[in-house]
Amino acid sequence: MIFDYLYCKPVKEVVPKGSAPVDDLNHELVKTIDKIDDNVDNAAIVESNGSQWNDVVKYRLSDDVEITGSEQLTESIRGWRLNIVDELDKLRSKWDTGKQEMYDKKTDTNAFLNDNVFNNKFENEELVVPSVFLSFGAFCSGRILSNPKNWGHSKTGSLTAVRSGLLYKSLTNLPSRLLLPWIFAGYTFSQFSPKTFDNICKVVEEDLLPPAFAKSCRDNWNSIYVNGIKKHSQGLSSSIDENLQNSIRSIREFIYKSLY
């Protein structure tokens, strides 16, 4: 409230009737302000030193309350206040703009995911949520399996310590500890939600990874897994199935010939 009164300026000078002429150097002038601000209804009387070298002004309100202020200080404070208000307006404008940009990005991201990733209605309604929980369980299993402490390994050489074998070294080294949980989680999710998993891989390959790196990864995957491990495993499986059928047929023929 006091700063509101400091913002007021005397607007005119009047000399009361019946008073002697006023000496600018030895007497005080009487100034009248019609209205200090919107909160003051009655007129206020202001007394100030008439010297041009002193800008200190005393404001006397209708309830005999005096406020001493400096016109120069008042102008400075008013400038500071206007600067603060201007900076606050700029910050508010930036904040509103940032909120709108975040909302637009969120809307665009949701639309992109719905169109390119979660576009299989059956998996969205029935499989995605259970697949996420199962993948989390597989991730925890990978963490447990790759933790050296869970293998009874001890650096102190206690009675429960085990010898460092090949399997222990393969599963507990640093690359395995970093990759094995994610491999377990990804494989589990791909088995229970295959369409969504393929969409995720496609989005990562086309939109996130550099084209050259994505092509190199795809070629390595095809050469190592698709044309290598998967093809040989399918051939081995079909060979075992065929040999098993032939063996069963031979046994049945032998039993039949032996009986008849």
UniProtKB/Swiss-Prot annotation:
One of its GO terms (biological process) is proton transmembrane transport. The gene is MIC27. It comes from the Eukaryota. Residues 146-169 are mitochondrial matrix. The chain crosses the membrane at residues 127-145, 170-189. One of its GO terms (cellular component) is mitochondrial inner membrane. This is MICOS complex subunit MIC27. Component of the mitochondrial contact site and cristae organizing system (MICOS) complex. Keywords: Hydrogen ion transport, Ion transport, Membrane, Mitochondrion, Mitochondrion inner membrane, Transmembrane, Transmembrane helix, Transport. Component of the MICOS complex, a large protein complex of the mitochondrial inner membrane that plays crucial roles in the maintenance of crista junctions, inner membrane architecture, and formation of contact sites to the outer membrane. It is a multi-pass membrane protein. Belongs to the apolipoprotein O/MICOS complex subunit Mic27 family. It is found in: Mitochondrion inner membrane. Residues 1-126, 190-260 are mitochondrial intermembrane. It comes from Vanderwaltozyma polyspora (strain ATCC 22028 / DSM 70294 / BCRC 21397 / CBS 2163 / NBRC 10782 / NRRL Y-8283 / UCD 57-17).
